[in-house]
Amino acid sequence: MKKIMHVAEPFATGVLSFLVDLTRQQVEEYEVYILYGVRPLTPDNVSNLFDKRVHLIKIDSFKGAIGTVFNFKAYRDVRRWYIKIDPDIVHFHSSASGFVGRWALPCKKLSAFYTPHGYSFLMRNGTKFKRFLFWLIEYLSAKRSAVTIACSEGEYKEAMKLSKRSTYVNNGINTKNLKSFVRSISKIQHPIKICTSGTDSLSEKSQTF
């Protein structure tokens, strides 16, 4: 059975839910491993969210985006687990994982993929220097051999500015599983209220991503 190794420094919120859904399908055909870091929003029971066949490997040297990029031990740890697992496919998630993974591993010799999950340099609530630093991280990482898989068309357009080796798969849920719950309704004649929940962050503005 072929192996997939995911590298996810920010193992929380959107990246976490993305991996829960993705690996649920992958374990039917692959051995799946996830190298992850703990963030303040990482659930205590995170292992209970995944299929028992998923191998979760906590990486202590993953300490936030910037802290990980400038931590030599993070590169060594990713490299060490890569050699031990010997995966056929590697998928990096978010900026720090993408930078560390693409520079620590021989991407030209393997099937390597990177998903930004929202480019940090586009955030509106950070300083100019911080946005520039994240842009530089993405710019340098894009020089390595890996295919960027964006989560939306907007993110794909930004990815193409960094690397032509880019594509996108719209992020969302499989509506086929919801068809049995959908009922026909008549045209609404009055205003309706819609409530949504999620991370309160300006970096996730819909018009940007």
What does each model-found stretch correspond to?
Residues R76-R80, R131-V147:
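Membrane-proximal helix-turn-helix segments that form the acceptor-binding/catalytic region
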Residues K2-M5, P106-M123, E138, I149, ...:
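Active-site proximal beta-strand in glycosyltransferases
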Residues L16-D21, T196-F209:
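A conserved mid-protein helix/loop that constitutes part of the nucleotide-sugar donor-binding site
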Residues H6-F70, E155-M160, Y168:
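N-terminal strand-loop element at the rim of the active site
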Residues H55-I57, Y139-V182, K193-S197, L202:
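Donor nucleotide-sugar binding/catalytic pocket of nucleotide-sugar-dependent glycosyltransferases
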